[in-house]
Regions:
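Intrinsic disorder/low-complexity segments
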Residues: 6-11, 31, 49, 360
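Sec-dependent N-terminal signal peptides
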Residues: 17-29
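Kelch-like beta-propeller repeat domains
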Residues: 3, 37-43, 47, 54-365
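Generic hydrophobic alpha-helical membrane-segment signal
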Residues: 6-9, 23, 248
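C-terminal motif of bacterial Sec signal peptides marking the signal peptidase cleavage site
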Residues: 33-35
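Generic short amphipathic/hydrophobic targeting helices enriched at N-termini
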Residues: 2, 12, 22-25, 76
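N-terminal secretory signal peptides that target proteins for export/translocation
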Residues: 1-17
């Protein structure tokens, strides 16, 4: 399915995450003031068995009202001021679990699930300056719950689900017809991918029957090398890159949501479980704004959440920093400049809205 790459301020090094999406039918703006202090408690519980069906997802009944500020901080602690609100534009139709790429001047929204629970081949181009959305092509292989990364300037889509789990690697770079350029060593869906600028990395997911633990690296989108192994196989994790490492947050392992935080060293390929989320979480997405790593939305059990957490890689701590405009899961995410775009998703049904999360340096804790 949700993203933005290592340097989210550069439109061509977008991190594209798995494809989970959800949005909300509210227009209030949520104001968040964020710092790395006042971490939440950690949980080591395995969590409850999640539902794989949208019909069983429920909106969190205890969510704070949109627009209510949450402030944390301590003297001398740098802070980032976030605002979240619905964008002025919407998608032509509701979609969840798409892959979203940042492009020059906009977004590319690829694949996903429709409100009728069917996989779409649609490719949409969003012009952020003019707030317009237009059809930009069709996938050769329709997929949802795929993953994307930018490799040598090419927008590549890896795997995904449809009538069967796919191994296709599809080049969806604007300016050329979408095409299948190669295949993963094995089919994968519910996976994530990131880029470090020189190469793309494919992590997590499953092949239709068992979880995938091999970490793949590609420098051209055509050949893949195994560079490491995940300590815990997960589907639907959130992913971010920070400090020369890939971080996986939560996800589903053996049909149960997990609290695990996995760190993969990009130099050695070594992976380890280094900490835990405050509670089991899957179907969330992560993004990086002004150097801060944030985990947003997702599901705990069958409940869709609107919570936003900030992650401190140095201390392996999470800080609850506020709420999205509404409960949200299974959305696609990409970062353009200092704004993260949370596209589509489930709330708990598929939606056609886009949420903008903006960051400004400073702010008064």
């Amino acid at each position: 399915m949700s993203v933005a790459p290592v340097d989210p301020s550069t439109a061509h090094r977008h991190q594209v995450l798995r494809l989970l999406n959800a949005a909300c039918a509210v227009t209030a703006v949520g104001l968040l003031t964020v710092s790395c202090s006042t971490p939440t408690g950690s949980s080591t519980s395995a969590g409850s068995s999640p539902s794989s069906s949208r019909a069983h997802a429920a909106t969190a009944p205890g969510s704070a009202a949109p627009g209510s500020p949450t402030q944390t901080g301590a003297a001398g602690t740098p802070s980032v001021r976030l605002t979240s609100a619905l964008a002025a534009f919407t998608l032509p139709a509701a979609v969840s679990r798409p892959t979203v790429f940042a492009t020059v001047g906009g977004l590319l929204v690829v694949g996903g699930l429709t409100a009728a629970d069917s996989t779409t081949s649609s490719i949409l181009r969003v012009d952020l300056a003019h707030t317009t959305v237009r059809q930009a092509g069709q996938l050769p292989v329709p997929v949802h719950d795929a993953a994307g990364a930018v490799v040598k300037g090419r927008d590549l889509l890896f795997g995904g689900g449809s009538t069967a789990v796919s191994s296709a690697v599809q080049d969806v770079t604007p300016g050329a017809s979408p095409r299948v350029i190669s295949h993963l060593p094995q089919p994968r869906a519910d996976l994530v991918a990131v880029s470090d600028g020189a190469a793309g990395y494919v992590l997590g997911g499953f092949n239709g029957s068992t979880g995938s633990t091999t970490i793949l690296r590609t420098r051209d989108g055509r050949t893949f090398a195994t560079v490491g192994t995940l300590p815990v196989s997960v589907r639907y994790p959130a992913v971010a890159v920070s400090g020369g490492a890939v971080w996986l947050f939560g996800g589903e392992h053996a049909g149960r949501q997990t609290t695990d935080v996995q760190r993969i060293d990009l130099t050695t390929g070594r992976g380890s479980v280094v900490g835990h989320l405050p509670h089991p979480l899957a179907h969330a997405s992560a993004f990086t704004l002004r150097g801060g790593v944030f985990v947003a939305g997702g599901r705990t059990g069958a409940t869709v959440t609107d919570a936003v957490l900030r992650f401190d890689p140095a201390r392996i701590r999470f800080t609850a920093v506020g709420h999205l405009p509404g409960a949200l899961s299974d959305f696609g995410v990409a970062v353009v400049g200092s704004t993260a775009y949370l596209v589509g998703g489930e709330s708990p049904k598929p939606v056609n809205t886009v949420i903008q999360v903006r960051a400004q340096a400073g702010g008064t804790p």
